Amino acid sequence: MSAAVVFILFVICLVIAIPVSISLGIVAVLPGAFDSSFTASASYVIRSMLGGIDSFPLLAVPMFVLAGIVMAHGKISQKLFDVFVFFIGKRTAGIPCAVIITCLFYGAISGSAPATVAAVGSMTIPLLMELGYKKDFSTAIVAVAGGLGVIIPPSIPFIMYAMATGESVSDLFLAGIIPGLLIGALLMFYAYYHCKRYGEDKEKINAKVSELRSKGLFSIMKDSIWALLSPVIVLGCIYAGIASPTEAAVISVFYALFVSLFIYKSIKVKEIWGIMVEAMKTYAPILFILAASTAFSRVLTLMQVPQTVSAWILAHFTNEIVLLIVINIFLLIVGMVMDTTPAILILSPILLPIVQSIGMNPIHFGVVMIVNLAIGFVTPPIGVNLFVASSLTDVPVMRIAKKAAPMIGYFLLALLLLTFIPAISLCLL
């Protein structure tokens, strides 16, 4: 069975709404089923699935998922938002910018884009609407800014990329900091432009900020400092050599539980079991996709797909700039129709040799790949962030996408800068 037939069958499975994990499992088994001489028998695929999830670094993923859910229940996003509103709330676009900064910080806690949208959006979208911002704009800005959750470290997709390519998780986390800040800054620039052009209800905004400031800086900081310290502790443990990324993920869970139970007292001990069940329900599908993606990736390697694709692309695109643009367009399209985990695990082994042949750093390519897929979070038809945000406000997905289009444009501008200026990603390494 040829690789082209395998990919066509995979697309057909997706089109007829077979779950991604099952689709991957089916197409991983088919080559061996139709050709008894092919190395990848059914037992090989099963062993590959089990081997794919038998990884110590991978343990960081469920831990970050659990930490994000604990912090969502613990109302930590509210504490983060309050401190940013205190300082910049009265400035032009101060409230939308505070939302974007909150997404940056919450992304540095949860490592997940949909989790960031759900936690920050459920709290900030009603407030934005109360202060006079239109529902479409309020929903769109949270949906797009939530994409920062997979770029700012710790990032679950970076862990997946490290697993697929053998690169350092710590280096990938470090490489994501400046790109995440750059994209956040561009989104804030757009928010400023939008508010300048369409205006704001300054009376309502000033009243809300004045009410918050009446509590005093000490009171706000006392409430917020524990939330602000969370990403500092997690990343500090990694880069100070105190803990590996996996161990830091466990630390983040205990820190989130400690702060939520004993400092903010926003969750009760009896709620912990429900939180753990929610985390398991969130992670279980990811684990199944991960196992099936690993098996499918190994089958493609046995079929020599990476070598074939690499040879074809390098033969037809000799200009490095054109090659990188083509790869970016391909990844953008993939991000629109495929979940992040299988996209990374299947495509990294195929595309990495191609970009390495033109001298591109694997860490740099990892950042470019994740930013491409992050744009897919807010792009129809699969854009997960759009559906999460829509569930919060009942705004139709396509209306959110239309309002988000200018912000996606700034995301694309950042992508171009990151692609052709490697120093943005690599300057901290």
For each feature predicted by the language model, list its residue ranges.
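Alpha-helical transmembrane segments of multi-pass membrane transport proteins
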Residues: 1-429
